[in-house]
């Protein structure tokens, strides 16, 4: 598509088209004709004869154009020398290179000037792809940079150049860069173009346009094919690029220096430039070796296990790490631990008063000097290659936050089971609110991330999940399916084995979410946590009571519950208008009960508390406990439409339980929560509960 020149525009700069030529009688006339045929008329065409030795054939063709072109003849000095000669003699504000064997489409200059006219920065370099043709000008195929990189990346200075996507004749360059940066290096026979583009692109803005505007001829007479030292020159050029680039430039191009180097190595692996490939590969490996990881271990008693945990870090295949041990006011004799820490200079030991693991980890973060932070509880263990594999994974995928799968072991260190939590990855928010499978010793993140996101110290249980939720709300989560840590199960002292501690953690997480202005918008996802907490507290705390309840006749339980509900919520003076309506409502209730039980079966696989306990038992227990325990916190409840709705509109614990269970089921579906709320409102209105 041709972009028509805006006749009202005052942007109409002179463009100099420079054609360097050496023995170019075969193709030069076509090149000059394509330059003179440009629809943009404010141009000058400069032909520089670089000392051709073809009995004057090249010069004769050039002179035949008379004053239509500006013709110069000089001694042979190479392509770079001829281009420099043309630049020194050009009058235009923009430079456009045309090889003597290539061709411009008629709208090449006009199209690029129109693009510049729309850009605020008139010093931007415009470029695009090209069409490859054979010696007779017959079409071969298109070279499209946008098939290799996204448009955003094609506009990042240097990146398209370092992926071999820049064709010099597609460029439109402000002449100022030749005066302010450099000219072509005349000592380079075949890489003088990329050498100069590298220098200019480091300071200039570039803009990719997808329209094909040039034809590049592929034939056996091209100069670069005749230079025996071409590969050696290219190896040296690409190696120099790698050595000159700063870390900031690499990060700008690919997000991290490691990612840039690995992708550059991958690009170079398919070229003859194997020395440059080896350099890029070695530089990438060195990035990993140089990446320091700070491993933070909070300690409270259990010194023997703590020493085992530290040893699992000292045995890592990745050697650049520091171990930061935070003694959180242990009451046991810690002399052996202190003695052990002094044996290795990579271990730093700090003592503080007991304020909980969140406070201890935060102190560790403040004392860390690594690029990355990994957490390890004092009774857990790392696999020997944990840091190496997770670090490489994060660098390769440009993650700043990740976790892995893990194994559970008993107090003796014996294997119990594998937990495939690493499959939980990507954009996990907001579902992470209702299901957070991340184990502390599997986590690794950047120091910068944790400096900005500390653990909530006012929470003693569930503080880790609170932080993971907060971080995941703004960042992708990297997940590794391979098991790289061992989590020790310590009976009742382990959170998920202790109903009271587990429930308190869930309540803490819920409170944290509802008291955060942003997270509170996703309040329906806390329903799963609340119902699980109540179930744990009111059912798991008494195995005998549970067994007794399981043996009760379900229909009798429901009948008693209905009677209790009737006594509690219905006005004694109110009676139904007729028996038929009563039967209708009763049938509707039974139908809805069957529907809910059907929904319950569909989610049993994802909710272990449903598979373990009868549905009516959960309702009976929840109704007696929920409001008292879980709605005590009045802070910012106006941000939670769900809790406000319950407290204002409802008077019955039974109905609260019913809503909780329906919303728990609905929350497993992406669009189910609001629809269920509407359904419940209609149900209550029909039953005169407002």
From Swiss-Prot:
It comes from the Bacteria. GO terms for biological process: biosynthetic process. Residues 553-601 are annotated as: Disordered. The keyword Transport does not apply. InterPro entries: Glyco_trans_2-like (IPR001173), Nucleotide-diphossugar_trans (IPR029044). GO terms for molecular function: hexosyltransferase activity. Residues 560-601 have a biased composition (Basic and acidic residues). Keywords: Glycosyltransferase, Transferase. Its EC number is 2.4.-.-. PANTHER family: GLYCOSYLTRANSFERASE, UDP-GLCNAC:BETAGAL BETA-1,3-N-ACETYLGLUCOSAMINYLTRANSFERASE-LIKE PROTEIN 1. Belongs to the glycosyltransferase 2 family. This is Uncharacterized glycosyltransferase RBE_0706. It comes from Rickettsia bellii (strain RML369-C).
